[in-house]
Amino acid sequence: MTFDENISRILVKDKEYEMPFSKGLLARSLTAAGMKPSESYTLAREIERDLNEQNVLKISKDELRRRVYYTLINRDYEGIGEKYLLWRRVLKKHSIIILVGGSSGVGTSTIAFELASRLGIPSVIGTDSIREVMRRSISKDLVPMLYESSYTAWTALRRSQWDEQDTKEMHLLGFERHVEPVLLGIESIIDRSLTEGTSVIIEGTHIVPGLMGEKYQSMPNVIFLNLTLSSEETHKKRFTARAKVSDRPLERYLENFEIIKEINQYIVEKSKENKVPVIENVSISETVQKCLEIVTERFSNLNDEPIIDSDMY
């Protein structure tokens, strides 16, 4: 029997659907659990080879996970095996909401999409998109700060407020007024995800610990992460790189860089006050790994079953 080498003849069965076995998907899951990418793909290829040699044409997702786990154990990857099963089990039973915050240019969208890919979470929502939705329901006359960028929102404050604040306080007050209506949209998405049992990653400048509802801080399946960049040079280079692949004007960011720095420091301080992890996002791979470690620790608190069921072979 012949088959396309790029499309596996092995079907993986779930309750509602069947799909071809994917070495790439399995390798991604193993990498998320801490295995090196090259090793994860090699192991995924070996598992596919073993299934073909045993003439397995259909296999349930649970059975495949058992095989992967015991293969990892036999290769002395016990820790990775436990993480692999933990993530699959928790994501199957619980809705997971990961909130990735940070000021403009620190890389929240990049890290959010990397985490979504590793964890198999299908939905990533940027807070800029939520802001656009809120603009359609709230008039500019009512909340003019919403119609500005996070770092220019202070210019929409009433003139009387300018006299009451020093410059930095005015910048941060404008930022807070800009963020507040967007938080309503963020909280609505979280509530809906929890109700419907779906997982989502939300990323962007508008995620500020301490400004969101307190109830979310105590929810074990709502995970806050904050990214930062201490190096001004690195931060500015991120804006330069962004300008090359988007229509966002570099000059606008650089002209307002001092305010962006103030906002960054404000979010970091709020994160520390609320015991939210602050991660220096210099290396994407290292940041993703640190985030995954934090997420794994939270997953452990959600998992109320032994890693391996007693009926596993």
From Swiss-Prot:
Catalyses: (2R)-2-phosphoglycerate + ATP = (2R)-2,3-bisphosphoglycerate + ADP + H(+)
- ATP-cone domain ranges (all copies): 8-95
Q: Which domain of life is it from?
A: Archaea
Enzyme Commission (EC) number: 2.7.2.16
Q: Sorted alphabetically, which SUPFAM superfamilies does this protein's record hold?
A: P-loop containing nucleoside triphosphate hydrolases (SSF52540)
Pathway participation: Thermoadapter biosynthesis; cyclic 2,3-diphosphoglycerate biosynthesis; cyclic 2,3-diphosphoglycerate from 2-phospho-D-glycerate: step 1/2
Q: Which keywords appear in this protein's UniProt record, sorted alphabetically?
A: ATP-binding, Kinase, Nucleotide-binding, Transferase
What cofactor is needed? a divalent metal cation
Q: InterPro entries in the record, alphabetically?
A: 2PKG, ATP-cone_dom, P-loop_NTPase
Q: Does the keyword ATP-binding apply?
A: yes
State the name under which the record lists this protein: 2-phosphoglycerate kinase
